[in-house]
Swiss-Prot record:
Known catalytic reactions: D-glyceraldehyde 3-phosphate + pyruvate + H(+) = 1-deoxy-D-xylulose 5-phosphate + CO2
Species in which this protein is naturally found: Deinococcus geothermalis (strain DSM 11300 / CIP 105573 / AG-3a)
Listed name of the protein: 1-deoxy-D-xylulose-5-phosphate synthase
EC class (word): transferase
EC number: 2.2.1.7
Molecular function as annotated in GO: 1-deoxy-D-xylulose-5-phosphate synthase activity; magnesium ion binding; thiamine pyrophosphate binding
Phylogenetic lineage: Bacteria, Thermotogati, Deinococcota, Deinococci, Deinococcales
Family per similarity comment: Belongs to the transketolase family. DXPS subfamily.
């Protein structure tokens, strides 16, 4: 008998997944193997996400659905679109990127969302919600116009479906009647709890049994399937709920879109059976699947909000790596909760970002002065306008990247009448791992272009509080912009007095003066440390500028350096140049900011270094301007 081998490799925990590097490999598996493959995908997703900062719960919930879609459709010929794209980790693994999953959201690695330039299997570049249906319609129209015959399937979550863009696209889809499959992935949650009438309708579908009631058109639609879907309940497992198409009660059918569901989104074999029969039907079809966010991971199923995008954790126990950090979002949430006790006119509105914007406690303490409008940034802003017209002091809590979606409402509904609306703009500047779709580097530029809108960049939590208090006491719209990241906590009751449009000197020096606010001010102070003759000004107001201090420093200094965590096109540096021109001053100015190009995912520090706005880069510029400075910081 031979001796046992001492170094036998342990059996793979993912034997089926190890055989799948493409959708064609997937199709070689038997249908009875698909549940095991989905389980292996989930195990791999948990392992990948345990390093922190990745979208865990949504990817676990969508795994069975993604397996079924790729088993039936032929990507990349057929187009599979994912709304938002953060649930598509299984899609990435099934399309040849499993070996790169450890690079997700890392510099030079895979995107955390789908991205056209990353893979031929990624139909759209995405990161914002509610865009998939309009994209799918465009692809279906292009297919028909060019006489082609590929299939189009869009996966959209119930949270994304609350967005006006998705509903408007659905209305047009029903009107045009082009062949496409819309998979409504109903996990009862986006990042925050879903709200609105459409959400209530879908919740009702899950607790009531609806049946086809005899409309002739509905019967024909059912009979178009090889096995009548009218018999679906008798042949499907108990997890498959029901089918109906009564236009009188179903808003999807009322729009002209065939509706099937709700069905169990974790019965992968049943999903395959349905998709095979629905994807070739004439006209648009919605397949409503009910999934569990965090599926297969008990602690993620129990708290999907916490596990939407967790930090580092132990996959076996779910224990997180502890953090005592205090975020800018938390600083805002604490400040506005206290402010609402002081001023009964305070009312906070957010577009589906309660947790991310630090508003959980506020929503609990002041539930009657809090509104989540869902993924509807335009509605949030115009609702605030209506409140301001009636004497309230609304605060719109919103990420910078999402405020872009409400530019017209800021201009048309708020600014023209100079209404008292405060915009608490979180994630201003580079956000890092989420990349180009989420970087908030355009807000200073587009808000500067709107008359009446003031813009503030607090340097710390105290200044944030001072700006919030000022906004509640003075007239006109005011945008307070702060970065992603951590800040030092300040005591409750801290409300420093701020004078409108004023800057402050933080370091004396009249040879070269650095003007910066917000996150960029940290770099400016570090760069100028122990450099005689180099001044630093906290340019905490981007609009209006402090004309008096600007004239003073520009008259004395050999040169000015502006630093901003915003695009150089039309931002703070541009504002300074415009002001100097109006003042008739010719002081040389070096404008440092984010280049006129989209910035891919990387750490915030890496992007800032690449953009040339971190402390070493500023010191290099100072040296070029003749300052005697060592380049090491």
């Amino acid at each position: 008998m031979s001796e046992p081998t001492a170094n036998l490799q342990p059996a793979s925990r993912t034997p089926l997944l190890d055989r799948v590097n493409s959708p064609e490999d997937l199709k070689r598996l038997g249908r009875d193997q698909l549940p095991q493959l989905a389980a292996e995908l989930r195990e791999e997703i948990v392992r990948v996400c345990s390093v922190g900062g990745l979208h865990l719960a949504s990817s676990l919930g969508a795994t069975d659905l993604i397996v079924a879609l790729h088993y039936v459709l032929h990507s990349p010929r057929d187009r599979i679109l994912f709304d938002v794209g953060h649930q598509a980790y299984a899609h990435k693994m099934l399309t040849g990127r499993r070996h790169l999953m450890h690079t997700v959201k890392k510099e030079g690695g895979l995107s955390g969302f789908t991205k056209v330039s990353e893979s031929e299997h990624d139909a759209i570049t995405v990161g914002h919600a509610s865009t998939s249906l309009a994209n799918a319609l465009g692809m279906a129209l292009a297919r028909d116009a060019l006489g082609q015959d590929y299939k189009v399937a869009a996966v959209i979550g119930d949270g994304s479906l609350t967005g006006g863009m998705a509903l408007a696209a659905l209305n047009t889809i029903g009107d045009l009647g082009r062949r496409m499959l819309i998979v409504l992935n109903d996990n009862e949650m986006s990042i925050s709890e879903n709200v609105g009438a459409i959400n209530r309708f879908m919740r009702g579908l899950q607790v009531q049994k609806w049946f086809q009631e005899g409309e002739e058109a509905g019967k024909k639609a059912v009979q178009a399937v090889s096995k009548p879907l009218a018999n679906l309940m008798s042949r499907a497992k108990s997890s498959t709920r029901h089918f109906f198409d009564p236009a009188s009660v179903n808003p999807f059918a009322a729009m002209g879109v065939r509706y099937v569901g709700p069905v169990d989104g974790h019965n992968v074999q049943e999903l395959v059976w349905l998709i095979e029969r629905l994807v070739d039907l004439d006209g648009p079809t919605i397949l409503h699947v009910v999934t569990k966010k965090g599926k297969g991971l008990s602690y993620a199923e129990a708290d999907p909000i916490k596990w939407h995008g967790p930090g580092k954790f132990d996959p076996a126990t779910g224990e997180s790596v502890p953090s005592n950090a205090y975020s800018w979002s938390s600083a805002f949430g604490d400040a506005v909760t206290e402010l609402a006790r002081l001023d009964p006119r305070t009312f906070v509105i957010t577009p589906a970002m309660r947790e991310g914007s630090g508003l959980v406690r506020y929503s609990q303490v002041h539930p009657h002065r809090y509104l989540d409008v869902g993924i509807a940034e335009d509605v949030a802003v115009t609702t605030a306008a209506g409140m301001a017209l009636q004497g309230m002091r609304p605060i719109v809590a919103i990420y910078s990247t999402f405020l872009q979606r409400a530019y017209d409402q800021v201009l048309h509904d708020v600014a023209i009448e100079n209404l008292n609306v405060t915009f608490a703009i979180d994630r201003g500047g580079i956000v890092g791992a989420d990349g180009a779709t989420h970087n908030g580097v355009f807000d200073l530029s587009y808000l500067r272009s709107i008359p009446n809108v003031g813009i503030g960049l607090p340097k710390d939590a105290a200044e944030l509080r001072g700006m919030l208090k000022y906004a509640q006491e003075h007239a006109g719209p005011f945008a307070i912009r702060y970065p992603r990241g951590n800040v030092e906590r300040v005591p409750e009751g801290t409300w420093p007095e701020l004078r409108w449009g004023t800057w402050e000197r933080l370091q004396d020096g009249d040879d070269v003066v650095i003007l910066a606010g917000g996150k960029a001010l940290e770099y400016a102070l570090k760069a100028a440390r122990d450099l005689p003759g180099v001044g630093v000004v906290n340019a905490r107001f981007v609009k209006p500028l402090d004309q008096g201090m600007l004239r003073e420093v520009a008259t004395k200094a050999r040169a000015l350096v502006t630093v901003e965590d915003n695009t150089v096109v039309g931002g703070f540096g541009s504002a300074v140049l415009e002001a100097l021109s109006a003042l008739g001053l010719r002081t040389p100015v070096r404008v440092l900011g984010i280049p006129d190009a989209f910035q891919d995912h990387a750490t915030v520090e890496s992007v800032h270094a690449r953009a040339g706005i971190d402390a070493p880069a500023i010191r290099t510029v100072l040296a070029e301007l003749g300052v005697d400075v060592p380049l090491e910081v």
